[in-house]
Amino acid sequence: MFEKIRKILADIEDSQNEIEMLLKLANLSLGDFIEIKRGSMDMPKGVNEAFFTQLSEEVERLKELINALNKIKKGLLVF
C-alpha cells in the first residue's frame, strides 16, 4: 500500500514539474491558465492551441493523480 502511495506522490511531483515547465514556456501563471480555461481571459497570441491542449492534459493528469491519492487516503483512514 505504501509503495502505491510513494508511486502516486512521485507521479504528482513529475506532473507538477511538467506543468511548471509548460507554464514558463508559455509565460503564463497558473492563475492565468485557470482564467483562460474558464473563458475569463483570452489566450495570449504566443500560445497556440496545441500547446494549450498539452498543458490542459497535464493538469487533468495531475487532478486524476490527486483523486487517486485521496481515494487511498479514504480507504486507509476508515476503520
From Swiss-Prot:
Q: Which SUPFAM superfamilies match?
A: HP1531-like
InterPro entries in the cross-refs: DUF2443, HP_1531
Q: Which domain of life is it from?
A: Bacteria
> Which Pfam families does the protein's record reference?
DUF2443
Protein name, per record: Uncharacterized protein HP_1531
* Originating species: Helicobacter pylori (strain ATCC 700392 / 26695) (Campylobacter pylori)
What does UniProt list as this organism's lineage? Bacteria, Pseudomonadati, Campylobacterota, Epsilonproteobacteria, Campylobacterales
